[in-house]
């Protein structure tokens, strides 16, 4: 049996400012650092074999503070863009109230809470076609990586720690818990609260708990 621990990053500066963040690489807030360290204290006594995180510093630093607290600063870490947050397209950087004022509450609610409707695309010189993701798009990016790189280690009896983001982790939990797309839309992951799965060699979940 292996353990899989999923942790959403601590509060970021843009969480604090109520902005759409997505792939923008913003730091943790002071509270976010405290939350990450608290997550570490909740995981003390657990020995990990490997950690995975995204390419964004708020997840990487959450992992760093957790590993400091549990005394495993030398744990092997793999960073991959597959675990990045959902890309919020042209909404990235906008205050959520300002966005609602601009587009209307109902439209913003659809972008945030529908499974397969992405926000308007963000177009740049490097990407003139533009990019944005729905939760469905995020899952299509995250799940193949999780199922090929992370879950096999857990099924082999390893203890694995994943520090990532609300929507990439929702995608993983949706798959593990066999949730419908309607159910996953109601799933809210608080910042820096570890979710612990005990998983056997067949991939069956033996136990799930939140540590808070």
Q: Each predicted region: which residue ranges?
A:
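Extreme N-terminal starter segment of soluble prokaryotic enzymes
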Residues: 1-5
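Glycine-rich N-terminal loop/short-helix segment of MobA-like nucleotidyltransferase
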Residues: 12-25
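Short catalytic helix/loop segments, enriched in acidic residues and glycine
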Residues: 22-38
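ANL superfamily AMP-binding
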Residues: 33-46, 145-151
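Phosphate-coordination/substrate-recognition cap region in phosphate-metabolizing enzymes
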Residues: 37-112, 116-121, 174-198, 202-205
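Short beta-strand scaffold positions
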Residues: 53-54, 162-164
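GST superfamily/GST-like fold recognition
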Residues: 166-171, 206
């Amino acid at each position: 049996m292996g353990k899989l621990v999923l942790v959403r990053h601590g509060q970021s500066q843009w969480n604090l400012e109520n902005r759409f963040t997505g792939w923008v690489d913003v730091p943790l807030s002071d509270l976010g650092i405290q939350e990450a360290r608290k997550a570490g204290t909740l995981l003390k006594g657990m020995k990990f074999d490997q950690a995975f995180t995204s390419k964004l510093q708020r997840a990487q630093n959450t992992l760093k503070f957790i590993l400091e607290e549990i005394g495993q600063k030398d744990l092997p870490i793999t960073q991959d863009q597959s675990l990045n947050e959902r890309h919020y397209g042209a909404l990235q950087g906008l205050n959520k109230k300002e966005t609602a004022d601009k587009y209307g509450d109902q439209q913003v609610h659809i972008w945030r809470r529908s499974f397969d409707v992405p926000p308007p695309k963000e177009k740049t010189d490097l990407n003139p076609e533009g990019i944005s993701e729905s939760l469905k798009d995020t899952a299509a990016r995250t799940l193949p990586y999780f199922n090929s790189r992370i879950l096999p280690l857990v099924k082999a009896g390893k203890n694995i720690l994943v520090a990532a983001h609300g929507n990439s982790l929702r995608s993983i939990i949706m798959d593990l818990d066999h949730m419908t797309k309607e159910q996953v839309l109601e799933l809210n992951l608080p910042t820096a609260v570890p979710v612990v799965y005990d998983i056997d060699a067949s991939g069956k979940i033996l136990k799930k708990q939140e540590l808070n």
